[in-house]
Amino acid sequence: MRAIICKDWGDPDTLELGELPEPALGPGQVRIRMRAAGVNFADCVLVRGQYQEKPDLPFAPGLEGAGEVMEVGDGVTDFKPGDRVMAVVSAGAYAEQAVCEATTVFHIPDGMDNMTAAAFPVAYGTSHLALVHRAKLKAGETLLVLGAGGGVGLTAIECGKALGATVIAAASTAEKLELARARGADHLINYAEEDLRGTLKKITDGQGVDVVYDPVGGALAQTAMRSL
């Protein structure tokens, strides 16, 4: 099958177009004919050999994608050949075919195209897991999103608003904050120009925030945590 191939650890510009064997299908897995694949920062880390998982070389990177189910392994009952799906893949979405666990495959809703679906699972899945399952964010609570202009930050804003929270978006430029405003953020903080903790006190009348969502882990992490 045709694939974008990582033959040695390095930057993304070292990837090559070539041929790889079709991946084997095991029990509980789904084979997908990939029509589109997402591009994430984690993909760059993966091909540099710095990710938490390190596939054997050579391999096709790509942690998420969308397409149609080709076949399913033993024990899979939620999907059948022809279903339109999006999926999180341990690696391999940058290929004509990918095999992944059925538990990381999702039906594509009617009206969503493959390009949109391919970029959905990682960013939105990260925010949904963090806010719904970990933080258990509730309606009426206040959510602070750091790095709010990035892909994961923007999805956190959308998830926060969908859950009924007041969302404070913090980013380093006016352009990024405009993106955050367009996604529904209630308050904006440019932490390159404003004191984050002081501005948070003003916005919350000194009460602080209920949840901090920090996809960056940078210098402002401690300041944000002290505002809880």
Sequence positions of predicted segments:
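Glycine-rich cofactor phosphate-binding loops and adjacent beta1-alpha1 units
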Residues: 183, 187-228
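Terminal peptide-recognition signature
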Residues: 3, 34, 98, 127, ...
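NAD(P)H dinucleotide-binding glycine-rich loop of Rossmann-like/cofactor-binding domains
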Residues: 33, 45, 56, 84-147
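Mid-domain Rossmann-like dinucleotide-binding core that forms the NAD(H)/NADP(H) cofactor-binding site
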Residues: 119-194
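Glycine-rich beta-strand-centered segment in the early N-terminal region that forms part
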Residues: 21-39, 50-92
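Short, well-ordered loop/turn sites that connect or cap secondary structure elements
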Residues: 79-80, 137, 228
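Cytochrome P450 core scaffold surrounding the K-helix E-X-X-R motif
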Residues: 42-48
